[in-house]
A protein has these predicted regions:
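Short, flexible loop segments at the rims of nucleotide/cofactor-binding pockets, characterized by
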Residues: 99-104, 133-134, 146, 172
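Small/aliphatic-rich secondary-structure junction motif
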Residues: 2-65, 165-223
């Protein structure tokens, strides 16, 4: 029986980081058993402004903000089309690619989390994005998700020259074992090289001998 196809949520904002993200997804995931959902949260006002707590109506009256909104919508529409064509070039079919543009509800990060609860196998996004309004940095959604998303694997993508070469920091914990499992599930193919890296801290034996309080009770010296 054929394995069930995995559904991957790819959060994009149309920036250069998102372009690198699409290339990474195309080169890393198998088009045979993966469905891709291109997901964008549309905000009326840049996230940086929303974080200031200043009234939204004030910014909507600004010509530069209205221009940003129109430009942002056009950019996302064009990017979605280009992203779909790019993924087709990697072997994905039109039926395996879904494009979703939704209005911001609870915040970009929280909206992504809520979407990820709908049967996804993983979430992929870039490290940060940049708006075109006075070169303001929108703020890293990835950093907000790292501490909040525990139910599915979160893959944060930067600029990668070799997405088929993977380094796993392995400490023998249950979480590390889960990471290995997910890498095996997603990054299939004979051309994928995985390195398990475990760093051992050196033990200062001299310090242990000189400071008996650092020794376990059974190893403490006994006075005659």
């Amino acid at each position: 029986m054929a394995d069930k196809k995995k559904k991957v949520l790819v959060a994009i904002d149309g920036s250069n980081i998102s372009t690198d993200l699409i290339s990474y997804v195309g080169e890393s995931f198998s088009p045979v058993n993966t469905d891709i959902v291109l997901y964008h949260v549309d905000v009326e006002v840049p996230e940086l402004f929303l974080d200031t707590g200043i009234e939204q109506e004030f910014f909507l009256k600004m010509h530069s903000v209205r221009a940003w909104m129109i430009e942002s919508q056009k950019r996302i529409e064009e990017f979605m089309k280009k992203a779909e064509e790019s993924l087709k070039g990697y072997g994905f079919t039109k039926d395996s690619i879904t494009k979703k543009v939704v209005e911001r509800k609870s915040g970009v990060a929280r909206d992504i989390i809520n979407e990820s609860l709908k049967g996804y196998s993983a979430v992929v996004l870039g490290r940060t994005g940049v708006s075109k309004l006075k070169d303001f940095i929108i703020g890293s959604i990835a950093s907000k998700l790292l501490g909040k998303m525990h139910h599915v694997p979160l893959i944060v993508v930067g600029k990668s020259h070799n997405p088929r070469k993977i380094l796993i920091g392995f400490d023998g914990s249950d979480c590390a074992k889960v990471a290995v499992k997910h890498v095996g599930d997603f990054f299939t193919g004979g051309d994928c090289h995985v390195c398990l890296c475990h760093v051992v801290r050196p033990i200062n034996l001299t310090q242990l001998v000189e400071e008996p309080e650092n020794l376990p009770p059974e190893n403490l010296p006994i006075d005659e």
